Amino acid sequence: MVQNNESVFFVECDSYKESPSTSPIRLDDLDGNDAVSDQGLAFDGDVGITSQARVRNPRAQIFEDSNTDVVLHLDDLDMVPLNTKFDMQMEMGSPMAMPAETPPPVEPLKTKDLAYSSLAHLPSYFFEQTHFRIDRKCLLEMSKLRRNYLTISKQDALSCPQLHSRVAGGYLKPVKEKLFGIRHFLDLEESNTVNLLQDGNYMTELFNSQINIPTFKEFREDFEWCLKIIRDRSLSRFSEKRLQYLVNKFPVFQHLHSKEEMRQSKKVPHKDFYNCRKIDLNLLLSGCFSQWQLTEFIWTKLRKEPDRVIHQAFNGSHITLSQLFKVNFEETGQFFNGLKIIDDSFLEWYKVIYLAKYHLVNDEMEIHTGSHGKQLRYYLIAKTFLEFDNYINGEYLAELLKTFLIKPQEESKYQLCQLSVDFQFYLHYDNSDVDNWWMVFANWLNHYNIFSNNIRWNIRISRIYPELYHTGKVKNFQEYLNLIFKPLFNAENYLHKSLGPILLKFLSQVSSIDLCIQDTDNYIWKNFTAVSCLPKDWTSGGDNPTISQYMYYVYVNLTKLNHIRQALHQNTFTLRSSCSPTSMNRTSQFSNTLNFTEHTEAILNNFLLACGGFLNAENLWNAPPSLVYLFYLSQIPMVVAPLNSIVDSKPTMLQEQAPTGLVLEPSKPYKKNPFMKFFEMGFKISLSSESILYNNSYTKEPIIEEYSVAASIYRLHSADLCELLRNSVITSGFSSTLKNKWLGVSLASHDYFVENTGFVDKWYDCKPNTSLEHNVPIIRRQYRSSTLAGEWRLIIA
């Protein structure tokens, strides 16, 4: 097998260095003069080339790790060939690259800015005079522009004060409350509290202060400048080649270092996928429990309280539970069996009709006068069990949340979530002291004690200005914005004797505001009003403002709110947005001179204005390559829900009842989701279960199910899963104090590994090796860091 004058080297690499840390082991020395014949090789259908001898060679040299009791055999080590010029050329991504004769020495990981790394050791290939109509450095300028917008709006992590005291043990310490405010911790002792809310004059002056925010004209100019860059053909071809290179580079890394990754993972005691923190970043309140859980809960209530009054009609008549589930059915004296209570027909109606038409704007008069039979029954089921503002004050929904979400998460300790709730545009309430959604929802959470240390809240804002305008609830776009943000700018709401502390407590657990861009959004314009007009002047006959108008004015109000909350030493909010698949077929009305789709408009707005991340990130796959490449370079957080995207939404009879312009997305298989491609390239991506009610989940741990399905289909191993979990934690809305406990990272500068997220937040490792907290092998993090640094060096060369 091996000639006497040639040797194959097997090298054991140190966990924190890429260079060999031990002397090479010659295969000749292992064979010696033994006359035993070499073991042959055979082809196996599943594995490939495998040894005929299933038992490890007893003559193989054994290595003992001094730090642990792990015994390593030669078969457990990666085979590292001697470096050649060809190997270095392939690592650079081009066979024409001529590497330096003497490679630079490998230095230990130190804190440094990846965008401004030294270029002294780069080969001449990186400095080739390639003709670009637009310089590649414009990508760096776009990232700087993004950082400028986000720091102005106080969305960066450094602008968010700590809301938790120091963590004791492995559990979260409850947040302490007091009248007129909440005890806030800025890495100080518990006695150093801030109670600025007691001064009403200071509050009024603070809420009326002016902030220097880029004007709409300046934002529009920046948007069009960025659009011209990402549409450049040569830059698009360059970005496409780099993305393809990143996709192909990761499998090569795994083939060369998979055993070393496995060895490093095994060295971490008592830390694997199941006992690493995992956060669902976009779990919807409207679907946070499964179909069988909802059915089981309804049957329990039917058995225990069948005569409970759950609804009162406008004519004064009452409807009980037993009457609700006998509408339009013969009186047999028996209830229906099994899943017939919550079947696919109801779920389809709930998703297509109720959430789009009745959920956001409460108009019971319309449903009672225009609906009957099955549709009325479906409406009452949704209103009774899936809403917090109803005749029974949301008692059933609170019980569902506590039973199937909060209690299991608190018991598991390692599962957390960011729960997304829709902002509902109600204009009046029975309680005269409460005239806005914020206080009603906060009061509901407090009444049923739904606040949990394992849950943070996202507020979803829908683009339903046309519906509100045509029903007479708003007269212009400014009134639409006032419904959302005016209660938060009213100092009297915070000084309210009973509801003020409750509102503060709720806002302290809100992490982000999400702008939802959906297929059902009104698209057709009738009056082409100039987009540069002020929101108070936008009536436009009910035409829906562009995505950029929504994003900019939500950004402006969020910026003002964050400045106020930071001055009061309260947590700040981030902005997130999504994108619908059908927007690729819709031309944007935002620019008078440039032609582009709403798809590109939504993604570019997210890049410029949103720090919280990009939702439904599978839609990024069809974006311009330069924009996709920018998302990688800036390490913008992305959230995908592969299981939720394969739901079959074929047209049915409900399509006739759906809102005008609804386009149902065709079903697609799991592997069509580009999630794995994004992960291989190195995007800051994480998984979410999103809506458990629709994806046929039959387990009590849906986020575990989501990761398990991905691991089964893509054959992910421990390092892959733990890297995804770490992404979900570091990009979440939980405080940096908790991230320090869970991941060993801090915003304070250290001399160890540094990780940039969103091109705005720098997270520093607090010790040389943090694998004990998250079990991501250091060699995997080295690969991600060096690959990203190489791409940045190529950009600024």
From Swiss-Prot:
Superkingdom in the source lineage: Eukaryota
Transmembrane portions of the chain: 627-647
Disulfide bonding pattern of the chain: none
SUPFAM superfamilies: Metallo-dependent hydrolases
Its membrane topology: Single-pass membrane protein
Stored PANTHER family: AMP DEAMINASE, INACTIVE DEAMINASE YBR284W-RELATED
Protein name: Inactive deaminase YBR284W
Organism: Saccharomyces cerevisiae (strain ATCC 204508 / S288c)
